[in-house]
């Protein structure tokens, strides 16, 4: 489910984000619960993400995982507690 939002922001559900990014729905939910992905709106029981921001963030998460970083370290990088500018 893709929805238009203010400022031409396209919102996307976790299910659709998983389908488009080839990342499992469970992983999307886990990353959200950890604070790696930001929910920008809610519609009933759906958590909606900014499509462009979420896709970019997921690409970074997948890349960092493939480079051997743990989710704990990735969380620090995403939150600005790490050295993201050097990655």
Predicted regions and their residues:
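Arg/Lys-rich, alpha-helical DNA-contact motif
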Residues: 1-19, 25, 29, 33-34, ...
């Amino acid at each position: 489910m893709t929805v238009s939002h203010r400022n031409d922001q396209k919102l996307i559900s976790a299910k659709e984000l998983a389908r488009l990014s080839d990342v499992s729905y469970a992983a999307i939910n886990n990353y959200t619960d950890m604070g790696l992905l930001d929910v920008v709106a809610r519609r009933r029981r759906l958590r909606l993400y900014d499509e462009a921001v979420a896709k970019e963030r997921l690409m970074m998460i997948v890349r960092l995982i493939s480079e051997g970083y743990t989710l704990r370290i990735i969380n620090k990088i995403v939150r600005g507690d790490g050295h993201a500018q050097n990655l």
